[in-house]
Amino acid sequence: MLSFQRLDVYQRAIEFLVLTTELTESLPRGHTERADQLIRAAESVVRNIAEGAGRWSDADSSKHYKIARGETMECAASLDVLKLRKLVGVDRYDRGIQLLEGVVAMLTKML
């Protein structure tokens, strides 16, 4: 296991990606763009945490953690849109937001 894979923030981001994958697979036809955008943002969070952890300088690490934090906010906004459009249930929405709040809090401490 690589060092970034042991980070709590990485594990939480992976958990959100799993939830996102399940959620987007259950969307009705015609919402491919919304699903793709959410998946891309969730994957970007995971990738930027990993890349930030692998950088040698604090400035380089911080740059990637900031990107991951911004992508986390995009994921939350995407969940809000899905909720507004009644495309996600309350339980999945609440769990997703809970995971994202944890990711944001941890990334903020890492900056």
Model-flagged regions — what are they?
Residues 1-111:
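Amphipathic alpha-helical assembly/interaction segments
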